[in-house]
Amino acid sequence: KEGYPVNIYTGCKYSCWLLGENEYCIAECKEIGAGYGYCHGFGCWCEQFPENKPSYPYPEKSCGRK
């Protein structure tokens, strides 16, 4: 799958500011076992995302909401 990895504690995607190929996003995506990552829409987007890893939006927690 493809998508935004999510911080399960906050429900937020990982923010980024340098659009396109981005070392921070590549590292975040590799951390969860994805094949590749880049900054898209000010969030890290991962390709070849493992099916068993959560992605944004995270149903159990809405980013910035209680």
From Swiss-Prot:
One of its GO terms (molecular function) is toxin activity. It holds the Pfam family Toxin_3. Residues 1-64 form the LCN-type CS-alpha/beta domain. Disulfide bonds join C12-C63, C16-C39, C25-C44, C29-C46. The modification Cysteine amide is found at C63. GO terms for biological process: defense response. PROSITE patterns: LCN_CSAB. Expressed by the venom gland. The keyword Methyltransferase does not apply. SMART domains: Knot1 (SM00505). CDD domains: neurotoxins_LC_scorpion (cd23106). GO terms for cellular component: extracellular region. SUPFAM superfamilies: Scorpion toxin-like. It comes from the Eukaryota. Has the structural arrangement of an alpha-helix connected to antiparallel beta-sheets by disulfide bonds (CS-alpha/beta). This is Neurotoxin Cex11. It comes from Centruroides exilicauda (Bark scorpion).
